[in-house]
């Protein structure tokens, strides 16, 4: 029993370290992509005539699909040189990460009490982290 508990704790620790490593890698990837976007903005703008549907909503979490559709449009209309190739590679990796995270949304059935606990946390996030529009 003691050995089982020890192995469980080791496994949980390993999972925590792995999750932190992925988050840290993603943070670096996003930071690098922001730097690249800033550096190559003029190249991406081109002649300035490309029109890309852009969400008006300030809660970016709600507009992920639209943002990535815009990225695809930009990618298809931008000359593919080494400078922008890395940007679109990074954006593709970020999308893959988000898609993996979205798969966690389809959870198991919980009792009402557990669902209400989750709902309270969810509403707390909306209340504190989302910009409310009127």
Curated annotation (Swiss-Prot):
State the compartments where it is located.
Answer: Secreted
BP GO terms, sorted: immune response; interleukin-5-mediated signaling pathway; positive regulation of DNA-templated transcription; positive regulation of immunoglobulin production; positive regulation of podosome assembly
- Which residues are in coiled coils? none
**Is NAD there in the keyword field?**
no
Top-level taxon of origin: Eukaryota
Q: Name one GO molecular function term.
A: cytokine activity
Entry's family note? Belongs to the IL-5 family.
Q: What is this protein called?
A: Interleukin-5
Q: What species does this protein belong to?
A: Bos taurus
Lineage in the entry?
Answer: Eukaryota, Metazoa, Chordata, Craniata, Vertebrata
Q: Which gene encodes it?
A: IL5
């Amino acid at each position: 029993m003691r050995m089982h508990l020890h192995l469980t704790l080791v496994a949980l620790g390993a999972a925590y370290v792995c999750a932190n490593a992925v988050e840290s890698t993603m943070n670096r990837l996003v930071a690098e992509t922001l730097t690249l976007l800033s550096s190559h903005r003029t190249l991406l703008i081109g002649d300035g005539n490309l029109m890309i549907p852009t969400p008006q909503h300030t809660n970016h979490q709600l507009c992920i699909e639209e943002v990535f559709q815009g990225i695809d449009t930009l990618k298809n209309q931008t000359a593919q040189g080494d400078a922008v190739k890395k940007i679109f590679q990074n954006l593709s990796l970020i999308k893959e990460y988000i898609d993996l995270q979205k798969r966690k949304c389809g959870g198991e059935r919980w009792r009402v009490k557990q669902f209400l606990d989750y709902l309270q946390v969810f509403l707390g996030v909306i209340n504190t982290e989302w910009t409310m529009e009127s």
